[in-house]
Structure formats: C-alpha cells, structure tokens
Regions:
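Glycine-rich helix-loop-beta junction characteristic of Rossmann-like nucleotide cofactor-binding loops
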Residues: 47-51, 129-130
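Conserved S/T- and glycine-rich ATP-binding loop of Class I adenylate-forming
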Residues: 21-24, 57, 72, 112, ...
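Conserved ATP-binding/catalytic segment of the ANL
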Residues: 206-256
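Conserved ATP-binding loop and adjacent catalytic segment of the adenylate-forming AMP-binding
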Residues: 159-203, 209-216
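Conserved AMP-binding A3 loop
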Residues: 16-43, 50-52
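AMP-binding/adenylate-forming
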Residues: 35-40, 56-121
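Gly/Ser/Thr-rich phosphate-binding loop
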Residues: 125-183
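Conserved pre-ATP/AMP-binding loop-to-beta segment of ANL
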Residues: 3-20
Length: 256
C-alpha cells in the first residue's frame, strides 16, 4: 500500500479502516477498526512524547501493517511534518536533515518508529548511526530487542530517547512503552494512563484499553505486574500541578 492509497482510504466516507491482526491474541485475521480509535491512539502517543504541531515524523515502515498506518495517523492528528521514505532495512540512508521533502527540519527528526532489524542495520553504518542520534524520540516495535542491541542503543550519544513498545494490531499499535536508554531506562513497560492491566490465573497479561479497543484482550504473554508511585505533573495556564499517584507496570516473563 502506498501513502496515497492509505490517505485515500483514510479520507473516504467510511468511519473504518481495514487492517490485519498480527496473531498476538489468536489466529491472524482481517478486521475493520474505527478511525476515531486510531486517532485516540495517535493522540495518546503524541501527548506522552510531547509531540507538537510542526514537529517531524519519519515514515519508514510498510503501510500494509498497523505500525506504518499509525505513523501517518499521528502526523494527521498532531499536524506533524511527515517524512516518507520507502520501507527498507536502512531507513536513514540518503536522508539530508537540511532538505527533507523540501523542508529544513532543524537538524533533527522529532519522531521515528522502526523494527529492531532496521535499528540494527542503521547502527552498522557510521553515517546512518550518526543520523540516528539526531532523532529525538525513537520507538521500536514489531519484534524482540535482544540484549546486545539494547546495550548498543544505551551507549548512543546525543539526546535521543529510545523506547520499546508493547502492543498489537488489536490495540492499534502500542498501549505501553519501556524506556531503553538514559536515566529512565527500565525493564518495566509503563501503560498509558487510559489503559488498565491485569492477569489471568495463568499469569497472562489482560489489557483493557477502551479508547483504542472495544474488547478486553487476553494475550499470550506471561507477565509480572507491580505497583509503583508516580509523580504526575500537569500544567494548566502556566501553573504546574503535582499529584502523586499509584500506577501499575509490567515486565514480560515468557509466552504461554
């Protein structure tokens, strides 16, 4: 699917888009998802990462899958400058930050989403590795991040914030993020505020995310869940409000 194809589908009269599930919660199958829920998912991620209108987003994943579609939807929801390149194992090859699709992006790409293999390949080429440090927020999904790749990412210089995602097609991309590098690096996934998590008797993760999925989802991932204290900061009319709240987070222990 091309970008033009997806935008045509997005802008048609239907309130739904066709996607195909990944098989995380059962046998892969086609499903129709509501555009408003995709916008909800986009808004949640953009708010979490602090993305704002005029920031840039790199589309380097196939639009045949939910991850690529959601990059476009985030750019629509938050009025981001979309940088579209052909899906490949080297997404940053031949990118000039002074002239991206005819626009100077001030020396950085604000947001990018990649699969682990794209990240690994990028790190093997010095020029591409250098460009990666000019990405402000990188989310990695669609596969496991092995220990050696995670260690290499933690050693990257610059101000890049790198996140591992947890989610599936049914949740319209991710419902939780885990910081890989920096002072906030952790092995625990932090669900978004609108997401509730629990476990089955077998220890499998149960997801209740009504803004993005109408049904409660039972996954095949065996997890450990713990509570932690979180200092929530909200800013209204230039006045900051601090609130200490108790939240749940999880880490993956295995598969059923």
């Amino acid at each position: 699917m091309t970008l033009e194809d997806f935008l045509s589908e997005w802008n048609n009269d239907s309130d739904r888009v066709l996607v195909h599930t990944s098989g995380s919660t059962g046998k892969p199958k086609p499903m129709m998802v509501e555009k408003k829920r995709m916008l909800n998912s986009a808004r949640i991620t953009c708010d979490f990462l602090g993305l704002k209108p005029g920031d840039s987003a790199l589309l380097c994943m196939s639009l045949d899958y939910i991850a690529g579609k959601m990059v476009v939807v985030r750019s629509i929801e938050r009025h981001l400058h979309l940088i579209s390149v052909s899906p490949s194992g080297h997404p940053l090859k031949n990118i000039d930050l002074k002239d991206v699709n005819g626009k100077d992006v001030n020396g950085e790409i604000t947001f990018a989403a990649m699969v682990p293999m794209q990240v690994y390949n990028t790190l093997q080429v010095p020029e591409e590795r250098e460009l990666l440090t000019h990405v402000r927020h990188l989310i990695i999904g669609g596969g496991a991040i092995d220990a050696s790749l995670e260690k290499e990412l933690q050693a990257l210089p610059g101000n890049i914030a790198i996140w591992s995602t947890y989610g599936m097609t049914e949740t319209l991309s991710h419902i939780a993020l885990r910081r890989i590098n920096g002072a906030e690096a952790s092995e625990w996934y932090q669900p978004f505020d609108s997401v509730k998590i629990s476990q089955t008797e077998e220890g499998c993760l149960v997801i209740d995310a009504p803004l993005v999925c109408a049904e409660t989802l039972v996954t095949n991932d065996i997890v450990e869940i713990e509570s932690y204290i979180y200092n929530k900061v909200e800013k209204h009319d230039e006045v900051e409000k601090n609130e200490v709240v108790e939240k749940l987070r999880f880490r993956i222990k295995g598969r059923k």
